[in-house]
């Protein structure tokens, strides 16, 4: 596999079950080692760096809303941890007043009322609220790469749409480089500036710009059948078109 991302690329990733989408993200993040080749960010080879070191450059939001936050800590404490990602840590006075004001402003933009619950434990939040908070935390220090692994799949449709809209807004406003795995083909077409389709661990289709904007779900189904010699039989993608 060979994949190059340009600065500011917002790439949606689709493919059948077992196509290798999540595996690709896990290799980039350092969860799985690569057998050969290399992974570079801004020309720096990070292939041998452990996951915790890559976290300095890479933000990530998982499918499970329970991941990405510390349930037993307050909202503001979670944000403080994310704010200090990649920094040396020592003894201090905790969260400073100006930090609280900053977190309050950021939480207000989410439109979920979390700015009024900064002292609440994260474990008391709904799945959608936790996922929105995780997204905010993942982008707090503007990562060089944001990985989104079906991060709306476990949410109800209304909440999923809210989180997806927030995602699009944050990535666009901050000009982030992002990879978003999704099973929803409509979202894959409408969100981002580039789309890649995977099958059996390979990228079989890579489209961007106006060509992507003009795509339809039927085009994607036909492209998959053409490239793979099969169809999305019994696949969740058929339920999300």
Give a label for each model feature:
Residues 212-241:
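ABC ATPase nucleotide-binding domains
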Residues 29:
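Helix-to-loop junction immediately C-terminal to a conserved catalytic motif
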Residues 45-59, 67, 89-92, 96, ...:
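ABC ATPase NBD coupling module
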Residues 182-183:
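H-loop/switch region of ABC-family ATPase nucleotide-binding domains
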Residues 138-139:
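ABC ATPase C-loop
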Residues 73-85:
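Q-loop/switch helix immediately C-terminal to the Walker
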Residues 14-16:
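The feature captures the beta-strand-to-loop junction immediately N-terminal to the Walker
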Residues 37-45, 205-207:
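Conserved ABC transporter NBD signature motif
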């Amino acid at each position: 596999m060979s994949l190059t991302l340009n600065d500011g690329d917002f790439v949606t990733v689709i493919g059948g079950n077992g196509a290798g989408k999540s595996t690709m993200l896990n290799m980039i993040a350092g969860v799985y080692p690569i057998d050969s080749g290399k992974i570079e960010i801004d020309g720096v080879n990070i292939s041998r760096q452990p996951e915790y070191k890559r976290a300095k450059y890479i933000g990530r939001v998982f499918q499970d809303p329970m991941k990405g936050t510390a349930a037993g800590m307050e909202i503001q404490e979670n944000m403080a941890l994310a704010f200090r990602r990649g920094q040396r840590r020592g003894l201090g006075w905790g969260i400073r007043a100006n930090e609280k004001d900053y977190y309050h402003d950021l939480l207000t933009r989410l439109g979920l009322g979390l700015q009024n619950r900064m002292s609440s434990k994260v474990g008391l939040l709904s799945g959608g609220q936790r996922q929105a908070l995780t997204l905010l935390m993942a982008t707090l220090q503007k990562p060089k790469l944001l990985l989104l692994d079906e991060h709306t799949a476990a949410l109800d449709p209304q909440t999923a749409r809210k989180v997806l809209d927030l995602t699009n807004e944050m990535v666009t406003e901050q000009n982030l480089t992002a990879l978003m795995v999704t099973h929803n083909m409509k979202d894959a077409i409408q969100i981002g500036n580039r789309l890649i389709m995977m099958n059996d661990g390979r990228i079989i289709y890579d489209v961007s710009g106006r060509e992507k904007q003009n795509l339809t779900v039927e085009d994607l189904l036909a492209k998959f059948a053409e490239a793979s010699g099969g169809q999305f039989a019994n696949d969740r993608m058929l339920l999300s078109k």
